[in-house]
Design a protein with these regions (language model features):
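Conserved beta-strand hairpin/beta-sheet module of binuclear metal-dependent hydrolase folds
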Residues: 1-48, 141-153
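Short Gly/Pro-enriched turn/cap motifs at secondary-structure boundaries
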Residues: 6-8, 103, 109-111, 131-133
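Divalent metal-coordination and catalytic microenvironments
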Residues: 18, 29, 59, 71, ...
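Active-site HxH/HxHxD metal-binding segment of metal-dependent hydrolases
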Residues: 33-38, 42-122
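A short acidic, helix-capping loop that chelates divalent metal ions and anchors anionic groups
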Residues: 88-92, 159-165
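Single conserved hydrophobic/aromatic residue that forms the stacking wall/gate
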Residues: 166-175
Length: 175
């Protein structure tokens, strides 16, 4: 599996494009906010001849969904995330205002729900979805057993507990 990492937006967010030898791919957390970030993502996809099969979100906090409208327009990709986070989409404008900016485009509805235990396939690669509520009610991590690789969004941070941007985050709530 080939992994390309981008660091996007003002918060910042790690966005990943995973692909394999078949040229099929998935995008995880398309947090591209600025036009140059969107174009960098597009350039990588197009230059590598990738056929993106899934647009996955680890959760639906504002900073992780900025690029979803762009990818829907550009490639017809509908975002996939856990249903427990869907309410964040209706609060995106209020979240943006809370941080002093306006969304360039409204969020787009989810195309599919991702549940604990779902297997996402692209090419010859499989990712297992694992529901890990805490940072947000619908937090999902994506695990590739064959590569022993985990894409955790904001659930794990190196050397810290990260930043809970939204007051509804409940890092110590027992689930």
């Amino acid at each position: 599996m080939r992994i390309k990492r981008f660091e996007f937006n003002m918060f910042p967010v790690n966005c990943y494009i995973l692909s394999d030898e078949t040229k099929e791919a998935v995008i995880i957390d398309a947090g591209c906010f600025y036009e140059e970030e969107k174009q960098a993502l597009k350039k990588y996809i197009d230059d590598n001849g990738l056929n993106v099969k899934h647009l996955l979100n680890t959760h639906l906090h504002l900073d992780h969904i900025f690029g979803n409208p762009f990818l829907l327009k550009e490639y017809g990709l509908k975002a996939e995330a856990n249903q427990a986070d869907e309410f964040w989409l209706n609060q995106a404008d209020a979240q943006a205002r809370m941080f002093g900016f306006q969304l360039p485009e409204p969020p787009v509805p989810l195309g599919k729900y991702v549940c604990d235990g779902d297997v996402i396939t692209f090419g010859n690669t499989k990712l297992e979805a694992i529901h890990v509520p805490g940072h947000s009610p619908g937090s999902i991590v994506y695990y590739c057993k064959e590569e022993n690789c985990l894409f955790s969004g904001d659930v794990l941070f190196q050397g810290s507990i990260g930043l809970s941007l939204i007051h509804i985050s409940e890092p110590t709530r027992p689930y």
